[in-house]
Curated annotation (Swiss-Prot):
Residues making up the signal peptide according to the UniProt record: 1-22
Organism the protein comes from: Californiconus californicus
Cysteine-cysteine disulfides: C32-C50, C40-C54, C49-C60
Comment on protein domains: The cysteine framework is VI/VII (C-C-CC-C-C). The presence of a 'disulfide through disulfide knot' structurally defines this protein as a knottin.
Protein name: Conotoxin Cal6.26
Keywords: Disulfide bond, Knottin, Neurotoxin, Secreted, Signal, Toxin
Summary of the tissues where the protein is detected: Expressed by the venom duct.
GO molecular function: toxin activity
UniProt keyword Signal present: yes
Length: 64
């Protein structure tokens, strides 16, 4: 029983770590630095928004 609980916890921890690492790697690969709601007015719109796009050259908005 203890071994089963330990294995379940280990799988959950590894899954969470993988998701966090995957998100960080995605941001690094895209070289993005703006989050939704951040102003992208002075940016040329080439991937600066980490999620979504630069809407009307004003703010980053998340994809729907």
């Amino acid at each position: 029983m203890k071994l089963t609980c330990v294995m379940i916890v280990a799988v959950l921890v590894l899954t969470v770590c993988k998701v966090v690492t995957s998100d960080q790697l995605k941001k690094l690969r895209r070289e993005c630095y703006l989050e939704p709601g951040d102003s992208c007015f002075h940016d040329d719109g080439r991937g600066a928004c980490c999620e979504g796009t630069c809407l009307f050259g004003i703010n980053c908005v998340a994809s729907w």
